[in-house]
Amino acid sequence: MGRKSLYLLIVGILIAYYIYTPLPDNVEEPWRMMWINAHLKTIQNLATFVELLGLHHFMDSFKVVGSFDEVPPTSDENVTVTETKFNNILVRVYVPKRKSEALRRGLFYIHGGGWCVGSAALSGYDLLSRWTADRLDAVVVSTNYRLAPKYHFPIQFEDVYNALRWFLRKKVLAKYGVNPERIGISGDSAGGNLAAAVTQQLLDDPDVKIKLKIQSLIYPALQPLDVDLPSYQENSNFLFLSKSLMVRFWSEYFTTDRSLEKAMLSRQHVPVESSHLFKFVNWSSLLPERFIKGHVYNNPNYGSSELAKKYPGFLDVRAAPLLADDNKLRGLPLTYVITCQYDLLRDDGLMYVTRLRNTGVQVTHNHVEDGFHGAFSFLGLKISHRLINQYIEWLKENL
């Protein structure tokens, strides 16, 4: 073997080593998933390197790369797409072109991205909104919100809430031809967090007379108190969303102070005065038995009250919807929840399903045995189309 052949062989082995990740047997299209993961891993590694050099914040590097995937608000043969502002928050509105004798459904969608990255303009979210508007014959509002690290909680929550309240005004609904009795909210990941949080907040808002008919939460992040759930342990290094990245997202939501991130990773961020909150996220009593699988529940390690005083957001129900008491949950609308087996956020969704059902809320739970975080969003994968079809069919029947 010549030098050139040997060199190519070594390079090929290194590339294969970088790309290859062992995956469960029931996961479809494993090599396509590995390629996508290698792309994301490369971005993450570059972002880490740039941050170490002091040139750019880690999340800002992610945003720069993501901006190349943004598309303009362009109408097509089926859907009219416009970009406007709802209460100073930039949104995209998708309206079917075909005539309708009746008022249409309305769906308010919130993108994911760990409260730090993402946009309604990303091609995947744009395409999802088009499909939903066309197939559901619905007006879809896809909202933006200000992002960390420049903006921290509660800014993201407030932006989404203010845009939603604007949409729920009678004259706005009339402008877009939306039936005020058929409005729903949806979001994925951090967007699912925000969807759950603002839906709870609406229950206490006397100024909003129009109520949501449904909420649809796609692998939502619902609490930062316990980041050592069975799903975190099982999927800490799974594709697309690792434990270290998720904890970084959570901490950046509240502050750029990395001490919160370190405390979260060691489970020493919750002060003993807030110990009563753990009953809302106690997986030993809230997870179905088959998801516990021999995991042993350990009592929390309490930290000092200093972090909670500096950054109280991580104990705030508006950031952690699982911390809502049963009286609040009891008033929530019909709910659809997607959870994925190979997702570290799986148990957040499972616990929310249990708590909602325990308070009498009607819940449709779609647990995806071959699913993973991002399965709904990577539109080049077969599983994404399957989940979107199931999602839209549920909306057709219930919204």
UniProtKB/Swiss-Prot annotation:
Membrane topology: Single-pass type II membrane protein
The keyword Endoplasmic reticulum appears for this protein: yes
Transmembrane segments: 6-23
Localization annotation: Endoplasmic reticulum membrane; Microsome membrane
Enzyme class at the top of the EC tree: hydrolase
Active-site positions on this chain: S189, D343, H373
Cytoplasmic side: 1-5
Record topology, Lumenal segments: 24-399
GO biological process, one term: xenobiotic metabolic process
Keywords: Disulfide bond, Endoplasmic reticulum, Glycoprotein, Hydrolase, Lipid metabolism, Membrane, Microsome, Signal-anchor, Transmembrane, Transmembrane helix
Residues bearing attached sugar chains per UniProt: N78, N282
Enzyme Commission numbers on file: 3.1.1.3
Gene3D superfamilies: alpha/beta hydrolase
GO MF term set: catalytic activity; deacetylase activity; lipase activity; serine hydrolase activity; triacylglycerol lipase activity
Reaction(s) this enzyme catalyzes, per UniProt: a triacylglycerol + H2O = a diacylglycerol + a fatty acid + H(+)
Disulphide-bonded residues: C116-C340
Tissue specificity: Detected in liver (at protein level). Mainly expressed in liver, small intestine, colon, adrenal gland and bladder.
Principal localisation: endoplasmic reticulum
PTM annotation, UniProt: Glycosylation is required for enzyme activity.
Miscellaneous comment text of the record: Can hydrolyze a number of clinical drugs such as flutamide, an antiandrogen drug used for the treatment of prostate cancer; phenacetin, an analgesic antipyretic which has been withdrawn from the market due to its links with renal failure; and rifamycins which have been used as antituberculosis drugs.
Function: Displays cellular triglyceride lipase activity in liver, increases the levels of intracellular fatty acids derived from the hydrolysis of newly formed triglyceride stores and plays a role in very low-density lipoprotein assembly. Displays serine esterase activity in liver. Deacetylates a variety of arylacetamide substrates, including xenobiotic compounds and procarcinogens, converting them to the primary arylamide compounds and increasing their toxicity.
Protein name: Arylacetamide deacetylase
Species the sequence originates in: Homo sapiens (Human)
